[in-house]
UniProtKB/Swiss-Prot annotation:
PROSITE patterns: RIBOSOMAL_S17
Single GO biological process annotation from the record: translation
Native species: Geobacillus stearothermophilus (Bacillus stearothermophilus)
GO cellular component: cytosolic small ribosomal subunit
Designated gene of the protein: rpsQ
Presence of keyword RNA-binding: yes
Cross-referenced Pfam families: Ribosomal_S17
HAMAP family, sorted: Ribosomal_uS17_B
UniProt keyword list: Ribonucleoprotein, Ribosomal protein, RNA-binding, rRNA-binding
Name the record gives this protein: Small ribosomal subunit protein uS17
Assembly with partners or alone: Part of the 30S ribosomal subunit.
Length: 87
């Protein structure tokens, strides 16, 4: 019924855009240590489909889970939340 709402959505930073129509997004999350209660930072890289090659390195983007598009690509670009500042 509303299966589309069950998909995972992450916000992360683009760390690579060297591939055609593919970006690598670094997603950082915090988890609480089970015994000591300290927040520990975890990070994971996801490859995402960028149809129009619009995301650049340093951009903050939102990605959504989708069907497998290649051997390693299971996410697609939803929107660019914040553009990187070019110096």
């Amino acid at each position: 019924m509303s299966e589309r709402n069950q998909r995972k959505v992450y916000v992360g930073r683009v760390v690579s855009d060297k591939m055609d129509k593919t970006i690598t997004v670094l997603v950082e999350t915090y988890k609480k240590h089970p015994l000591y209660g300290k927040r520990v930072k975890y990070s994971k890289k996801y490859k995402a489909h960028d149809e129009h090659n619009e995301a650049k390195v340093g951009d903050i983007v939102k990605i959504m889970e989708t069907r497998p598009l290649s051997a390693t690509k299971r996410f697609r670009l939803v929107e660019i939340v914040e553009k990187a500042v070019v110096l």
